[in-house]
């Protein structure tokens, strides 16, 4: 065993981080709904403190609506929208921003408490400070994303949307990793190739989630709604894949290219997960590793089916959100498997010396 027995602080930290991870997952889903309902530009100002409260009077609602009318999205897409219709999209964006504020407080206040108690130090302390820094950065990235749709565009820039989501998922994955590190386990002796494929699965999952965000940002799921064919074949014509100049712009703005990359990465992820599950069993890596590999493979299979159904049904909101939620499960299982197969060399949490002694005696 490479970690000391859990202490009261360890259990409290795990509960705290589990709540934060759950809130982040909820925020990702609310963010997805905000995008799918085209609500993300309904609040055109960034007021971190005073923006916590929604409009509380008819005049305040009228002012918020008039501010929305000044941006291109209203003029080009929603001209004639009623105040009642505006309120519908406003509440999605307001809820998304409110969740961000709540997550900030739920993370910061207990973190300060644990710091005051001396319960976090060393690798754990550094990791928690890093997560805090990423969370602060995420707020700035969120406004950077929204600002891209307030001048000439009628929606936020897809690359900025994908960056915003990817940073949220990085924070989520970091918390999942930390939670797993705080749970004692036996050190497993496994071949290095298993660790390599486990980490490759994490990397490919992140790439796939980024591409999925690009698909959503471009509304690329509303076109090429056939499977397994795309644009008339299994592989689109090169002239269509690279239709824009310079060539690299197709990787971010060509609907066909982005959707094709999303499909190909899904196939790659599924094949890699299947190979990893087989290799873990062949190597005799232990029951936990085998179960983890099988859970990950099953989640990816479900996610693939949901993705195909979402495409064929032309992106119904409920199915698209289920697809996004399952992506979080895939990421969770991938991170857990990578941690499960990674060595632990030091204790993950600061504990009293008495606990260390008790662990050694046991």
From Swiss-Prot:
Keyword Phosphoprotein: no
Localization: Cell membrane
Subcellular location, principal: membrane
Pfam family, one: COX15-CtaA
Top EC class for this record: oxidoreductase
Pathway(s) of this molecule: Porphyrin-containing compound metabolism; heme A biosynthesis; heme A from heme O: step 1/1
Any one GO molecular function term: oxidoreductase activity, acting on NAD(P)H, heme protein as acceptor
Catalysed reactions, semicolon-separated: Fe(II)-heme o + 2 A + H2O = Fe(II)-heme a + 2 AH2
UniProtKB keywords: Cell membrane, Heme biosynthesis, Iron, Membrane, Metal-binding, Oxidoreductase, Transmembrane, Transmembrane helix
Membrane topology: Multi-pass membrane protein
Needed co-factor(s): heme b
Binding-site positions, heme: 262, 323
EC number: 1.17.99.9
Family classification: Belongs to the COX15/CtaA family. Type 2 subfamily.
Known function: Catalyzes the conversion of heme O to heme A by two successive hydroxylations of the methyl group at C8. The first hydroxylation forms heme I, the second hydroxylation results in an unstable dihydroxymethyl group, which spontaneously dehydrates, resulting in the formyl group of heme A.
Protein name: Heme A synthase
Organism of provenance: Bradyrhizobium sp. (strain ORS 278)
UniProt gene name: ctaA
């Amino acid at each position: 065993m490479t970690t000391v027995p859990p202490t009261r602080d360890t259990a409290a930290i795990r509960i705290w981080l589990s709540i934060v991870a759950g809130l982040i997952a909820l925020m990702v889903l609310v963010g997805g709904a905000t995008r799918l309902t085209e609500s993300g530009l309904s609040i055109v100002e960034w007021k971190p403190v005073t923006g916590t409260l929604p409009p509380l009077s008819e005049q305040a609602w009228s002012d918020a609506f008039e501010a929305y009318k000044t941006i291109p999205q209203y003029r080009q897409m929603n001209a004639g929208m009623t105040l009642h219709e505006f309120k519908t999209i406003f509440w999605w964006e307001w809820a998304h921003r409110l969740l961000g504020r709540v997550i900030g407080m739920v993370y910061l206040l207990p973190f300060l408490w644990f710091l005051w108690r001396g319960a976090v130090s060393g690798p754990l302390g550094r990791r928690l400070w890093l997560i805090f820094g990423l969370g602060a950065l995420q707020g700035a990235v969120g406004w950077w994303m929204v600002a891209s749709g307030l001048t000439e565009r009628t929606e936020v820039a897809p690359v900025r949307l994908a960056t915003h989501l990817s940073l949220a998922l990085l924070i989520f994955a970091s918390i999942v990793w930390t939670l797993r590190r705080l749970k004692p386990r036996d050190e497993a002796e496994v071949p290095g190739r298993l660790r390599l494929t486990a980490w490759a699965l994490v990397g490919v999952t992140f790439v796939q989630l980024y591409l999925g965000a690009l698909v959503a940002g471009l509304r690329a799921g509303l076109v090429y709604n056939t499977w397994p064919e795309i644009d008339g074949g299994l592989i689109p014509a090169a002239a269509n894949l690279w239709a824009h100049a310079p060539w690299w712009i197709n990787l971010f703005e060509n609907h066909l290219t982005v959707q094709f990359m999303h499909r190909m990465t899904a196939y790659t992820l599924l094949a890699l997960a299947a190979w990893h599950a087989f290799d873990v069993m062949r190597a005799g890596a232990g029951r936990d590793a085998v179960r983890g590999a099988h859970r990950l493979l099953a989640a990816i299979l479900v996610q693939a089916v949901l993705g195909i159904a979402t495409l064929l049904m032309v992106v119904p909101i409920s199915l698209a959100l289920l697809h996004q939620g399952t992506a979080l499960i895939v990421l969770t299982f991938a991170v857990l498997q990578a941690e499960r197969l990674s060595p632990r060399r030091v204790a993950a949490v600061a504990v009293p010396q008495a606990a260390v002694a008790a662990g050694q005696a046991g």
